[in-house]
Amino acid sequence: MATKLIKHGSKAREQMLEGIDVLADAVKVTLGPKGRNVLIEQSFGSPKITKDGVTVAKSIELKDKIRNAGAQLLKSAATKAAEVAGDGTTTATVLARALAREGNKLVAAGYNPMDLKRGMDLAVNAVVEEIKKSSKKINSQEEIAQVGTISSNGDKEIGEKIAKAMEEVGKEGVITVEEAKNFSFDVEVVKGMMFDRGYLSPYFVTNSEKMVAELENPFILLFEKKLSNLQPMLPILEAVVQSQRPLLIIAEDVEGEALATLVVNRLRGGLKVAAVKAPGFGDRRKAMMEDIAILTKGELITEDLGMKLENVSIKSLGTAKRVTVSKENTVIVDGSGDKKNIEDRVLQIKSQIAETTSDYDKEKLQERLAKLSGGVAVLKVGGATEVEVKERKDRVEDALAATRAAVEEGVVAGGGVTLLHASQTLTKLKVENKDQQAGIEIVIEALKDPLKQIIENAGENGGVVVGKLLEHNDKNYGFNAQDMQYVDMIKAGIIDPAKVVRTALQDAASVASLIITTETLIVDEPSDKEDAMPPMRGGMGGMGGMDF
């Protein structure tokens, strides 16, 4: 067992805050319409250029263990914001740093950290309620485009394309982003389906940055029962390996030896595979698997028809242009199903909807209908170079996530204005003691920081602008950092999704509270010894075979 380094009190927190500063300083430069790019070296290929806060945060690892602990805590605020709301990662980082730094100063001055935390929690809850009250639902294409434009750093084309995609497949529809083979940026609607089942093991992941399994031109095996032993499947697996194409397995469950064997072969490179549970339950599960079979021109392997896995040929497998499997969802894009068969299936479901008297059954049938007939909108992002395409694709993905958040919880005035004006409502909060009051004061000051940072990235004095804005009672009155003018932010179309602003604050406060209430830090002691394992060399022979 490795020896441990133990630090206590303000010394431990100060070193953690040094790590927080390193990460926050790298991330904060990306905030706002005039935020700068960050260039990140990659282990292979061209460097990555990004203005996405969470991408910058994820790339940072510090040598000093204690400083790194602080940086990793701050990174978790950005990552959580990205997972829940899809955006607001830089705002979360800036807020968390401000809250943690001010909180630590007060703890060092003798304030009780638990009461500071209670005061901060009271303030954050009050601001969250204020955000909910201020939010405005969005309905029009123009408003959807505005959110997409702001979240993609002022790129109007991205905002307009996202609005168009939502118009094509509906606000709840499936929209994916992929790289185009040319310079253009287009929206294409293809046959596709998404269902809420993710991979059964993270070892199926092919893109570790996004934690998804991406299968190009895969075969799709649909099996009605549980898979616990792969022995009956050997002939079909061998045929798939010979074809050099990936395989998606959809079954009631894949467990035990079967799952372990698939994982081993995936890791050894013998078979590019992903396994997911079938969507739905009982009879509904069987119906949904039949929908997938029709969509992909495959067969549902079911014992009701006397079918056995050992007798299945590759002709019984469905196919699609692409499948993406995340932790929670599976998206099948452009299945090979016959258009006439899909239309017949749609008509069959429509007649079932007309006949059913159960509201629940009707709702579930309508979900199936939407999955079969809605299609998937694909945003195809092009550019002059690979670096440019990847950078723009990142911005499109951010903007899409932010737009979904806006549709879900509405929008508020952007540019840090909502947080700034919400801070003014906190002076009326009732508390039990001066330490809790100090916790509220920490939040009031921290809420000014995102707006200050946006202004400073635009080359102006943030403190002066904040002072001028606080003289006004209008909650929508703010500073347009793009045109350097004081405007009504809502009328100017400078809006943020309420969910993004709310999540950024809650995640930042959560991390800051952990830091100020930490008294002891235990990390592995740095070792001077070199790694005992020699570096792996390229071209490991004999790794491509199957191992069943």
Curated annotation (Swiss-Prot):
Family of the protein in this entry: Belongs to the chaperonin (HSP60) family.
Record protein name field: Chaperonin GroEL
First-tier enzyme category under EC: isomerase
InterPro entries, per the entry: Chaperonin_Cpn60_CS, Cpn60/GroEL, Cpn60/GroEL/TCP-1, GroEL-like_apical_dom_sf, GROEL-like_equatorial_sf, TCP-1-like_intermed_sf
One biological process term in Gene Ontology: protein refolding
Keyword Cytoplasm: yes
Organism: Rickettsia akari (strain Hartford)
GO CC, alphabetical: cytoplasm
UniProt EC number: 5.6.1.7
